[in-house]
């Protein structure tokens, strides 16, 4: 693993990030396949193709939905918004942690936030079908924020102010908008921050 403090090598900005790239490609391919089969804005169609729905997960034990729901998106704008953010910040975290640790953070935040969201919906007696990579992406943001703070507020082209501003705006937008899974965002952020603190090792 390379060092990513103030003395990081500038050519690190241009290194390949294969895991992040693969995640984006998988999301795009899944969306293309679902778009070919039907309407990705149709709730019933998306439920039938792996979206999250707490009665199916908790009562029917369809636990695979905790993972599959993180790779499906409701419409092209939902996909593009998530993938643009992931393309911008995911490679930074992959270079800082390495491929395996990055994948652990991404999947753990995605699955963990889906689980928390399902339990929260059950407790509130809400019956919404949901999906998307935003819980995992908030995990990436949380992990990055911890790492940036440990690197004196800067990591490559990111700083702590940018990340806190993004997270704050996204959560505010979610609270003020309908149809946003805020619990997935918040829990994904917390999971990512915890794992980022545990997995990151800064070379001296």
Residue spans of the language-model regions?
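A detector for small-residue-rich transmembrane helices and their helix-helix packing motifs
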Residues: 2-204
């Amino acid at each position: 693993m390379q060092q990513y403090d103030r003395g990081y090598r500038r050519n690190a900005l241009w290194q390949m990030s294969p895991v992040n790239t693969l995640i984006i490609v998988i999301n795009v391919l899944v969306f293309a396949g679902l778009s070919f089969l039907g309407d990705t804005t149709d709730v019933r169609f998306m439920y039938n193709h792996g979206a999250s729905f707490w009665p199916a997960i908790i009562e029917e034990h369809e636990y695979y939905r905790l993972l599959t729901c993180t790779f499906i998106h409701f419409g092209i704008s939902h996909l593009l918004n998530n993938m643009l953010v992931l393309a911008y910040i995911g490679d930074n975290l992959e270079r800082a942690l390495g491929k395996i640790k990055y994948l652990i953070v991404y999947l753990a935040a995605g699955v963990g936030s889906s689980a928390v969201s399902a339990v929260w919906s059950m407790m509130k007696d809400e019956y919404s079908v949901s999906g998307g990579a935003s819980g995992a992406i908030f995990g990436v943001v949380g992990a990055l924020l911890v790492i940036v703070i440990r690197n004196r507020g800067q990591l490559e082209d990111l700083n702590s102010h940018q990340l806190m501003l993004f997270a704050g705006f996204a959560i505010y937008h979610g609270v003020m908008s309908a149809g946003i899974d805020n619990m997935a965002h918040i829990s994904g952020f917390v999971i990512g921050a915890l794992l980022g603190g545990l997995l990151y090792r800064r070379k001296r």
